[in-house]
């Protein structure tokens, strides 16, 4: 399948012994995965922040968040290495144009005692359900399950399609070992 992947880091916390690495994976044009990994000394509480267009209506659900805008709707779910994730909805000032601040819907997602957070956003084409299921990640060469601090996997079922995503947080095996979920294995940091 086709996908787009970007990886970068934020060095603003290096003086505190923390390097933030962000990976963004776009699967087709309607599934976006944002994975933040804190390297070094992990902060006790980690967070991700999101701002939305002023016309978007947000509602929390048992699975995460639903959003409805002027032309689209979306679902968001949040994961933090099996730790509890808290959501806080509010508003925040945002400038889309020079010197024109507006209050827009804002979401903060927090978790404690984790080294990574993953947000999965699915742009919905209809009202059919979106299912995002955490999956155990396996190393085929050593025939064992990796712990969430080593890797996390997700199966995303939406818009009539099914995708699997794996994030490795540390090297597991060597460059010839396969890591994966649901019987599908591949090389690299993201499959």
Per-segment meaning from a language model:
Residues 1-191:
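CBM-like, beta-strand-rich accessory domains located in the C-terminal region of large
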């Amino acid at each position: 399948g086709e996908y787009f992947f970007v990886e970068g880091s934020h060095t603003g916390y290096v003086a505190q012994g923390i390097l933030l690495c962000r990976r963004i994976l776009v699967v087709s044009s309607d599934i976006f995965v944002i994975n933040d990994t804190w390297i070094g000394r992990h902060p006790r509480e980690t967070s991700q922040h999101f701002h939305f267009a002023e016309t978007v209506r947000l509602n929390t659900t048992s699975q995460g968040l639903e959003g409805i805008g002027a032309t689209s709707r979306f679902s968001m779910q949040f994961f933090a290495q099996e730790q509890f994730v808290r959501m806080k909805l509010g508003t925040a000032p945002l400038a889309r144009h020079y010197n024109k601040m507006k209050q827009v819907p804002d979401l903060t997602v927090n978790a404690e005692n984790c080294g990574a957070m993953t947000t999965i956003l699915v742009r919905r084409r209809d009202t059919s359900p979106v299912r995002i299921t955490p999956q155990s990640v396996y190393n085929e060469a050593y025939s064992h399950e990796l712990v969430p601090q080593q890797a996390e996997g997700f199966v995303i079922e939406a818009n009539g399609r099914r995708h699997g995503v794996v994030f490795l947080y540390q090297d597991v095996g060597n460059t010839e070992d396969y890591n994966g979920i649901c019987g599908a294995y591949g090389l690299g940091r993201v499959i």
